[in-house]
């Protein structure tokens, strides 16, 4: 049975909740395509570009991981005057996928794995208070590493999203600026909650290593809760029928013809007849 009476147990619960929420947000942000969005007025469509999904308006979305086989550039004949041979390139149309999308995707996946291990570590530290020190150390490592990777992921995305070739959507006639979509803001919210998770994990470590009485109290309350649950479970089990003592000891008074031997009643309430023989007279 779950109990959260001590401060250590409450901080463990807060760490678990924040890690689960952060992991869910970054997972939802990763699988959705709205990291960069733009209105293509030439084609009258709302384009969403994600880390692995591309949704061109009302058309069906498709997943892509590499655009290396598609040539989006053409060389310009006019080169710079002072830099002979340094010919600029002209972007024909906006690529669906850049290499840094793949890097951000990998960082997000590793961050989700670390956050899941963080949740597992805090659960183990709650269930086994006597062996919680190793799990608390792992909790701090996984929580901090997940938050750091998510921060690096967002920085990589923001820096590359502001580049000229990925900031604008080249339409049929005009060029339209891309904006950040809800997926990006969900990832940012996940990072904020991951930082809160790191703070809660630090509090769990503080109470585990500096306040051993909190660990002892947590172990005691958890053990008492389990004992009470076992007693309550045993009381709820169906009990066998027990007839009253007055029914078991009921006797019929003697008559003028002799004494009457009453039938015996078993503990289950079944009637047992007794046979009279010549020794009874």
UniProtKB/Swiss-Prot annotation:
Mind telling me which Gene3D superfamilies this protein's record contains?
Answer: 1.20.140.150
Q: Which Pfam families match?
A: Clc-like (PF07062)
Keywords associated with the record: Membrane, Transmembrane, Transmembrane helix
InterPro entries membership = Clc_prot-like, PMP-22/EMP/MP20-like
Entry's localization field:
Membrane
Q: Which domain of life is it from?
A: Eukaryota
Give the bilayer topology: Multi-pass membrane protein
Transmembrane residue ranges: 13-33, 104-124, 137-157, 184-204
Gene Ontology cellular-component terms for this entry are: membrane; plasma membrane
Q: Where is the signal peptide?
A: none
| Family statement | Belongs to the Clc family.
Output this protein's name.
Answer: Clc-like protein 5
Source species of the chain: Caenorhabditis elegans
The gene is clc-5
């Amino acid at each position: 049975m779950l109990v959260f009476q001590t401060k250590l147990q409450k901080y463990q619960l807060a760490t678990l909740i924040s890690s689960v929420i952060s992991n869910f947000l970054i997972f939802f942000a990763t699988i959705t395509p709205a990291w960069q969005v733009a209105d293509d007025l030439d084609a009258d469509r709302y384009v969403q570009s994600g880390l692995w999904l591309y949704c061109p308006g009302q058309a069906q979305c498709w997943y892509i991981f590499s655009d290396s086989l598609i040539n989006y550039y053409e060389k310009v004949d006019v080169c710079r005057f002072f830099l002979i041979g340094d010919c600029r390139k002209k972007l024909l149309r906006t690529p669906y996928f850049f290499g840094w999308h793949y890097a951000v995707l990998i960082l997000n996946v590793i961050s989700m794995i670390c956050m899941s291990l963080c949740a597992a570590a805090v659960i183990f530290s709650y269930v086994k208070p006597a062996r919680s020190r190793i799990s608390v150390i792992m909790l701090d490592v996984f929580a901090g590493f997940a938050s750091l990777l998510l921060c690096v992921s967002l920085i990589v995305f923001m820096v590359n999203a502001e580049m000229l070739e990925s900031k604008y959507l080249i339409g049929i006639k005009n060029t339209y600026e891309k904006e950040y979509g809800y997926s990006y803001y969900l990832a940012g919210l996940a990072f904020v909650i991951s930082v809160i998770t790191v703070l809660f994990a630090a509090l769990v470590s503080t109470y585990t290593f500096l306040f051993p009485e909190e660990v002892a109290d947590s172990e005691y309350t958890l053990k008492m809760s389990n004992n009470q649950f076992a007693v309550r479970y045993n009381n709820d089990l169906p009990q066998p029928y027990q007839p009253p003592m007055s029914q078991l000891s009921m006797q019929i008074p003697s008559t003028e013809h002799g004494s009457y031997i009453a039938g015996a009643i078993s503990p289950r309430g079944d009637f047992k007849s007794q046979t009279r023989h010549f020794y009874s007279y």
